[in-house]
Amino acid sequence: MSDNESDGPTKQSTEPVDNAWSLKIPTFKAEDNPHGLVEESSFATLFPKYREKYLKEVWPLVQQCVAEHHLKAELDLVEGSMVVKTTRKTWDPYIIIKSRDMIKLMARSVPFEQAKRVLQDDIGCDIIKIGNLVHKKEKFVKRRQRLIGPNGATLKSIELLTDCYVLVQGNTVSALGPYKGLQQVRDIVLETMNNVHPIYNIKALMIKRELMKDPKLANEDWSRFLPKFKNKNISKRKQPKNKKPKKEYTPFPPAQPESKIDKQLATGEYFLNKEQKQAKKQQERSVKQAEAAKKQDERRNKDFVPPTEDAPSQSRKRPAETSKVDVDALKAKLMKANKKNRS
């Protein structure tokens, strides 16, 4: 690989690099591979029926785009497949892999205007399969919708923070953008399908973006600034109201329950004749009737039992001093009232 003269010579350094993402990838030129490719390579991918109309409309643009890199593209509407091939003029050995990714993205409903960006050197793609991460369909639909958010707000915020184009389609999530952003998108998608809300990862990315602006914190640990969320999911399994104690294990089988004949043998009723059995039943019946009559009499006589009265308390009696009346004061009061009436 070599650079243009305008780019200047590359510095070959063996020293460790602090930020590998900041390194500029040298561009691959036609002069680096003057002999071209030895063999023809081709990749094909199938597309669903509902993409046929769109692909038919944009296919001339696809052919024009790959022709700039000396590739050939074919669309088979009968088989439902897209094919990209190298030609004798193709000099970039990796461009066929990039074009394969482009047709894969287009098959996953990514528009051509976005899919053609993957042909650039600093742009990659990632198709994340999420269909087998959740067993129940209801949970899968709910978590996939959580990734999109209301009116696509969550998906838009992920795109802004990672500088990637993200599309949720069926059982896959297609991401297109710089390689660092693709790692972040994959982490967010996988954690969302594992029941971690994407807003937590979005908040962490926003904090990291602000911390990057401060050069003093470049070599420090950022974990103290990032929010820590605890899982508050409580087991929703209902416990039984009355728990039965577990019986002690015994190697012997349980005892056979007593039959009616066994009970009669234990009480001696089995050996009684018919008349004796009837006499015994009559005796038991008369005992029960006597007990019921006794309870009924007690219930009837309950209304005629006089209630218990409390003894008169001594505190209610007024002392002898309070019963005395001042006669002189009463006479004076009456005379005063008579004078007022006369006047």
UniProtKB/Swiss-Prot annotation:
Residues 230-343 are annotated as: Disordered. Residues 230-246, 333-343 have a biased composition (Basic residues). It comes from the Eukaryota. Residues 272-303, 318-331 have a biased composition (Basic and acidic residues). It is found in: Nucleus, Nucleolus. The keyword Ribonucleoprotein applies. One of its GO terms (biological process) is rRNA processing. It holds the Pfam family KH_KRR1_1st. Keywords: Coiled coil, Developmental protein, Nucleus, Ribonucleoprotein, Ribosome biogenesis, RNA-binding, rRNA processing. Residues 126-194 form the KH domain. This is KRR1 small subunit processome component homolog.
